């Protein structure tokens, strides 16, 4: 994708979560600090890898947490400068274990703290819960209008 990005900042997300982050505010925050990368941070009560964040929102490190930790996690919505491609070692690298860690070590990774809705979709239970919210027109991330399909019986 590097050839399509050119010299412009770009947005990247993982495909396993949904949220109602205001993209324009995320991009505005990214432009305000002059670093190479901004990730969206959310607080949640789950076992996930968490972020050590300074008072000025710089990400200093990544670590594992337990459910009662309370530390924020990477929600997977990012704004990146094209220089981030220099930190990638081909298609086989794991972005969050290589580039994001290196960016944090270099002091080039900032966090945009999101306090709204965020939900991972790592298993069928979470997928079904999100589909139910969508079908019932209670999906906080839904900012568009469209006809919502019925939930299949297996997903209820």
Annotate each PLM feature:
Residues 1-9:
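Active-site nucleotide-sugar/metal-binding loop of Leloir-type enzymes
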Residues 33-43:
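A short, conserved acidic/glycine-rich loop-to-beta-strand motif
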Residues 54:
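Extended acidic/charged loop-beta regions that coordinate divalent cations
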Residues 50-51:
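Extracellular disulfide-bonded cysteine-rich modules/repeats
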Residues 14-15, 39:
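Small/polar loops that bind or transfer phosphate-bearing groups
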Residues 9-11, 18, 24-31, 44-46, ...:
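Catalytic-core segments of class I nucleotidyltransferases/pyrophosphorylases
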